[in-house]
A protein has these predicted regions:
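Positively charged n-region of N-terminal signal peptides that target proteins for export
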Residues: 1-4
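Short Gly/aromatic-enriched secondary-structure transition segments
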Residues: 50-62
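Sec/Tat signal peptide C-region and signal peptidase I cleavage site
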Residues: 16-20
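Bacterial N-terminal signal peptides
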Residues: 6-15
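N-terminal post-signal-peptidase region of extra-cytosolic proteins
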Residues: 21-33, 59-83, 102-107, 152-153
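Exported/periplasmic cell-wall-interacting domains
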Residues: 84-172
């Protein structure tokens, strides 16, 4: 009985190592910026002024305009940075975007609302959450609560290429 916690810990460590190995190591030119064009539904990974990769993206369920308050379904616009990486996301993998910034907070506070938060670049949801999302997930390309979505395979590639601190410019 005393061995069970040790065995469980070993399984957890081995399992975590196996998950970490599924993310390939990127050895190309570093990504110096991410640029998102909301109207075109495109995201570009840049090295200086050269496009390294481009992806089609899904956005928040009400994508027109800048995110101002929690629950508005908009994807923010402006300059932010990647401030965290989540290998255990329910959306496969995810990269946190530093929304809200000082201006976002100031505006939301001025109208007595929350600006929201937890905006990410992420992959698709797991099946349980897809079913809960219903028709929007399956039939609408803009299905997130304000995040930027790509396929799981694309997210694996993006996750391996992006470091914390990478600037992201989200444009109309």
């Amino acid at each position: 009985m005393a061995r069970i916690p040790g065995i469980l810990a070993l399984i957890l460590v081995i399992g975590s190592a196996a998950i970490a190995k599924t993310i390939p190591e990127y050895d190309g030119d570093p990504v110096t910026a991410i640029v998102v064009h909301k109207e075109a539904r495109k995201m570009f990974l840049m090295h200086d002024d050269r496009v390294l990769r481009s992806y089609s993206v899904g956005l928040g369920f009400a994508p027109d305009g800048h995110k101002k308050i929690e629950g508005d379904g908009k994807t923010p616009e402006g300059r932010y940075v990647i401030d965290r990486k989540n290998p255990n996301s329910k959306f496969h993998l995810s990269l946190g975007i530093s929304y809200p910034n000082a201006a976002d907070l100031s505006y939301a506070n001025s109208i007595g609302k929350s600006p929201g938060g937890d905006i990410f670049i992420h992959g698709n949801q797991d099946l349980k959450h897809r079913i809960k999302q219903g028709w929007r997930y399956f039939f609408d390309r803009d299905w997130t609560a304000g995040c930027i979505a790509v396929t799981d395979a694309e997210m694996t590639e993006i996750y391996s290429m992006i470091g914390i601190g990478t600037p992201i410019f989200i444009q109309r």
